[in-house]
Amino acid sequence: MDPNMNSLLKWSIKAATEEQSSGENNNNNNSGNNAPADPSRGLTPQMLSTLFGGPSEADLMKAAMEALRSDEVDLENKLIAFDNFEQLIESIDNANNLEPLGLWTPLVELLDHKEPDMRRMAAWCIGTAVQNNEKAQDKLIVLNALPKLVSLATADTTPVVRKKAVYAISSAVRNYQPAMDEVTKSLPEGYSRDKIDAGDMDAVDALMDKLRAHKPTFVTCTVDRMLSPSKPTSSSSGEHVVPLRGTRALRVDRARALTMLASGRHAVTGTRLSYEAQAIRPHLIPK
């Protein structure tokens, strides 16, 4: 039986019993001063929703995620859906429903969204869902979401995204050592690799303060576009020459620029750049 329906049944039995008991007491008490019990006492919004056929909170969570993933919903309404979603998962029961509803994977995938506000809200929702919730904290490890959050916290170009990523990391690691160890392994250069006790709040706070103060170093790379998918030709110097059709600026951090040079993969999507990769030329790689 639906838990809300079961609660509704218990409430109705209790209310009927109390009403009968109250009636008997009134018959035995001629003063008639006993106030009737409030019939709505004990009813929850979820029970009323079940009674009147409204959508359950699980239904609302699924509907919000559908809106977030839909190409037909504009950014403004996506952010409204995200705000509603975040409020729903403030309840630990709803946060624990993310897994059976199949919502964890799409939520984590939204950390890669092209819109900064979508990345910000995804990190915010993750931080809310995992707070004081070991089951949800473990799910971030299973989904390999912690390295992504560290990357957002230290390298995203938008400050509010970095801020919410730190919030998510803070919620994920407190009192949960496996998550703390995973974050420690994912920290960029300049951070200690020494083990941090997830139960030591002073040590955790010190790491979070350092992440909040982190200032990414950015470099502008020029990615040359090809006129056609034909193979590049060779110049007299032996260097590959790619037919060009303008350039586009891609603002990335130093580590990501070096990764692009080494792997030939797009810094944002991770897809292979093919011959374009040979034309990536960082104007500056600061040390």
UniProtKB/Swiss-Prot annotation:
Its main location: cytoplasm. Keywords: Cytoplasm, Repeat, Translation regulation. It holds the Pfam family HEAT_EZ. Residues 16-46 are annotated as: Disordered. One of its GO terms (biological process) is regulation of translation. InterPro entries: ARM-like, ARM-type_fold, Hsp70_NEF-Inhibitors, Nucleotide_exch_fac_Fes1. It is found in: Cytoplasm. Functions as a nucleotide exchange factor (NEF) for Hsp70 chaperones which accelerates the release of ADP. Required for fully efficient Hsp70-mediated folding of proteins. Belongs to the FES1 family. This is Hsp70 nucleotide exchange factor fes1. It comes from Aspergillus niger (strain ATCC MYA-4892 / CBS 513.88 / FGSC A1513). The lineage of its organism: Eukaryota, Fungi, Dikarya, Ascomycota, Pezizomycotina.
